[in-house]
Amino acid sequence: FKEQVNAETNEIEKYKDITKKYVSEAHLVLYVMNSTNPIKESHREDLEWLFKTLNLLPRTVFVLSRFDEVADVEDEKEFNSAFDVKKQNVVSRLTDILGLDSASRACLSVVAVAANPFDMGIEHWLSNMDTFRLLSHIDSLQTATAEKIKNNGGLESIANETKRTIIREILTKQLPVDIDTTKQLEAEV
């Protein structure tokens, strides 16, 4: 990861740390994945942090991106078949990594989109919106995000849960440091 200097503290931050800060404060998470190999073993630590430590799973939509690379987006039957296989793969990998129970699996939201079908470019798709909506399946993402908001009690409820997530993140980082400091002070006294 590249480094960046924090203007306030003049400390060097890694982009991953910056990203983690913003994600921990997110109201809703769109977890965008490569459709070819959606959830890699190398992502285990980040997945555990996101969904166990921060408890963001109920507020996450998993997005299989560039789905036109793994399925014919013009053939609805093929698209749905490939999506079912990839969705099962995502659910299975998340279950293995996070130890999800059946209730958690049932609440998972997975969609597949092709944001730029056939790499035709934004200019083309802006002048062909109906075809874009049909081929991109972007409506499924819009529906999934609206359902996540509704299923989590609406915007105010999600904002309150975000506050709890931020507190949980602070406690996860700071509490062990404070306990160590207290132990050191007790040992000195």
Where are the regions that the model predicts?
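Globular "head" domains of long coiled-coil molecular machines
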Residues: F1-G153
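Extended helical scaffolds that flank P-loop GTPase cores
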Residues: G121, D130-V189
